[in-house]
Curated annotation (Swiss-Prot):
Small ATPAse domain (RuvB-S): region residues: 186-256
Record text on subunit structure and interactions: Homohexamer. Forms an RuvA(8)-RuvB(12)-Holliday junction (HJ) complex. HJ DNA is sandwiched between 2 RuvA tetramers; dsDNA enters through RuvA and exits via RuvB. An RuvB hexamer assembles on each DNA strand where it exits the tetramer. Each RuvB hexamer is contacted by two RuvA subunits (via domain III) on 2 adjacent RuvB subunits; this complex drives branch migration. In the full resolvosome a probable DNA-RuvA(4)-RuvB(12)-RuvC(2) complex forms which resolves the HJ.
Residues bound to ATP: 24-25, 66, 69-71, 132-134, 175, 185, 222
GO process terms (BP): DNA recombination; DNA repair
MF-aspect GO terms: ATP binding; ATP hydrolysis activity; four-way junction DNA binding; four-way junction helicase activity
Gene transcribed to yield this protein: ruvB
Binding, Mg(2+): 70
Location in or out of the cell: Cytoplasm
Role summary: The RuvA-RuvB-RuvC complex processes Holliday junction (HJ) DNA during genetic recombination and DNA repair, while the RuvA-RuvB complex plays an important role in the rescue of blocked DNA replication forks via replication fork reversal (RFR). RuvA specifically binds to HJ cruciform DNA, conferring on it an open structure. The RuvB hexamer acts as an ATP-dependent pump, pulling dsDNA into and through the RuvAB complex. RuvB forms 2 homohexamers on either side of HJ DNA bound by 1 or 2 RuvA tetramers; 4 subunits per hexamer contact DNA at a time.
Entry keyword Hydrolase: yes
Family, per entry: Belongs to the RuvB family.
Organism: Bradyrhizobium diazoefficiens (strain JCM 10833 / BCRC 13528 / IAM 13628 / NBRC 14792 / USDA 110)
Region Disordered: start-end pairs: 1-22
Protein name in UniProt: Holliday junction branch migration complex subunit RuvB
Residues annotated for DNA binding in this entry: 295, 314, 319
Lineage: Bacteria, Pseudomonadati, Pseudomonadota, Alphaproteobacteria, Hyphomicrobiales
Amino acid sequence: MSDPKANRMVSPERRSDDVGDTALRPQSLSDFVGQQQARKNLSIFIEAARKRGEALDHVLFVGPPGLGKTTLAQIVAKELGVGFRATSGPVIAKAGDLAALLTNLEERDVLFIDEIHRLSPAVEEVLYPAMEDFQLDLIIGEGPAARSVKIELSKFTLVGATTRAGLLTNPLRDRFGIPVRLNFYTIEELESIVSRGARVLNVGMSADGANEIARRARGTPRIAGRLLRRVRDFASAADADTIDRKIADHALSALEVDAAGLDAMDRRYLTTIAMNYGGGPVGVETMAAALSEPRDAIEDIIEPYLIQCGYLQRTPRGRLLTSHAFRHLGLAEPNRDAAQFGLFGTDESDD
């Protein structure tokens, strides 16, 4: 069974070939494009903390992958003029790992924990007093000889990032004084990101070329940067000094990313429902078997963007294609009564 996100050009998750995207990242809030209200608020909080000479309150970035949570965390540290340490939830396996990180922080430093929702309960218990009182409560030894030790910590800022806020425990979520939700980017914002990236990569970019890449980037800067690097390769091979709409369209079509940002896997999913199941409804387990993909991959990787774009509905009776999907596929929409759309369905099992 294939990993459905391993080779997808439009996967918002970080890929092994994304090492070049660090050069495209903005280095300050003023360079950062999009998330206007979040940037404005962060700028005020950072300036206030700087003026008081205090550590910034703990920050939680919430949003889909690829929207700039890690970049913003690095910018926060730079704007504060303090040290930056980065790790992720799965890496902190035990309380001792967290203690080692916290005790090495200097005053007002930023500790960034990506995928913070994946911290173990034991590690979270150690994190609570560290965030609230800047103290570590550790148990040294075992059995009758065990004793509790309190360690004073430097006042630091914890910046957490999560794609799944619902998996955070309430005690952890409540300890973040500055929650920041990141949203998908507009085409105009992505055009600015693509144009800036082209300047960083020293490649010419026309306005219509930037628009073509932005329209297919699924509202996600990481995808926009990845598409830009691949389109640049096509332009270099063709000895083109400037990426225009024609070059961008040729390159992205060769990469099987269509005008709506859908790739071969998206189209295969939609076409299977349209051709094999009359547009639905069809259960997710049936689709998993038909596509030879695990259920969680379909629910977490394939479906979210299709639902966001209005191509797919999740109904009590199963997955259902919309009229928009049939138009995109160039197929005639079958006659379907209202019950098929789940308006009167009561069966919540969905396979």
